[in-house]
From Swiss-Prot:
Species lineage: Bacteria, Pseudomonadati, Pseudomonadota, Betaproteobacteria, Burkholderiales
Record keyword Lyase present: no
Predominant location: cytoplasm
GO CC terms in record: cytosol
Keyword terms: Cytoplasm, Methyltransferase, S-adenosyl-L-methionine, Transferase, tRNA processing
Name listed for the protein in its UniProt record: tRNA (guanine-N(1)-)-methyltransferase
Function of the molecule: Specifically methylates guanosine-37 in various tRNAs.
Family that this chain belongs to: Belongs to the RNA methyltransferase TrmD family.
Positions with a binding annotation for S-adenosyl-L-methionine: G113, L133, G134, D135, F136, V137, L138
GO biological process, one term: tRNA N1-guanine methylation
E.C. number: 2.1.1.228
Subcellular location field: Cytoplasm
Molecular-function GO term, any one: tRNA (guanine(37)-N1)-methyltransferase activity
Organism: Albidiferax ferrireducens (strain ATCC BAA-621 / DSM 15236 / T118)
Length: 248
């Protein structure tokens, strides 16, 4: 798969693409990441990519033409017409289902906005989907692009040390969309806080039941809407429901 990143600050991506376990996906080409700067497609000696907003107001707006020329150059290098994603507060909040969809795709073109945003005419003409990380505003779309790339990369075969590691992540359908359970490692007692005895028992059935109940309890306390969704989807057993009833 290939992701083209349209950004005024391509240098921000260098450490991200060469660090951590997900670098395997990028360095091997399993997830091909290409960077494009709209400033390279701007006219004039100053390569200007932004201007004041019509109607007045603070800040600057990214101009449509440099973005459009940059996008056309990218599309000409791809073998298929790629969807164009814009990271924006107006977008749908990124979640596991969306990440899974993009991890199974051929990739996309990711637009990283800056300043007050993009000229709406470019959005209307080219953007096929908008994505948000949540109800807050960043200085640009680069961090959001990295979040999507990281989430997609770790789902690719051979990237994680254990192939099924991501199946135990929070929100994964394998866990019925619940939050993950707490985890512990050595020492067995730290500052008077012992590891739960069941995890030291070697009794795998009891351990798995404990983990299931911890996931249920944690999700009920912190993200009750996920419990409701799992119930609607028919993912909760009678034992699950009995445990949840005991927590009320």
């Amino acid at each position: 798969m290939r992701f083209d990143i349209v950004t005024l600050f391509p240098e921000l991506f260098a450490p991200f693409l060469t660090s951590g376990i997900t670098r395997r996906a990028f360095e091997s080409g399993l997830v091909d990441v290409q960077l494009a700067n709209p400033r390279d497609f701007a006219a004039g000696n100053y390569r200007r990519v932004d201007d004041r907003p019509f109607g007045g107001g603070p800040g600057m707006v990214m101009m449509a033409e440099p973005l459009a020329q940059c996008l056309k150059s990218i599309q000409s290098q791809r073998t298929e017409i790629a969807p164009v994603l814009l990271f924006s507060p107006a977008g749908q909040t990124l979640n596991h289902a969306m990440v899974q969809r993009w991890s199974d795709s051929q990739g996309a073109i990711l637009i990283c906005g800056r300043y007050e945003g993009l000229d709406q005419r470019f959005i209307d003409a080219y953007v096929t989907e908008q994505i948000s990380l949540g109800d807050f505003v960043l200085s640009g779309g680069e961090i959001a692009a990295m979040a999507l790339l990281d989430a997609v990369a770790r789902l690719q075969p051979g990237v994680l040390n254990a192939a099924d590691s991501h199946q135990q992540d929070s929100f994964n359908p394998v866990l019925d969309g619940l939050l993950d359970c707490p985890h512990y490692t050595r020492p067995e007692n730290w500052l008077g806080r012992p590891v739960p005895e069941v995890l030291l028992s070697g009794h795998h059935v009891q351990i798995e039941r404990w983990r299931r109940e911890q996931r249920l309890a944690l999700t009920l306390r912190l993200r009750p809407e996920l419990i409701d969704q799992a119930r609607r989807d028919g993912r909760l057993s009678r034992a699950d429901e009995a445990f949840l009833a005991s927590q009320v």
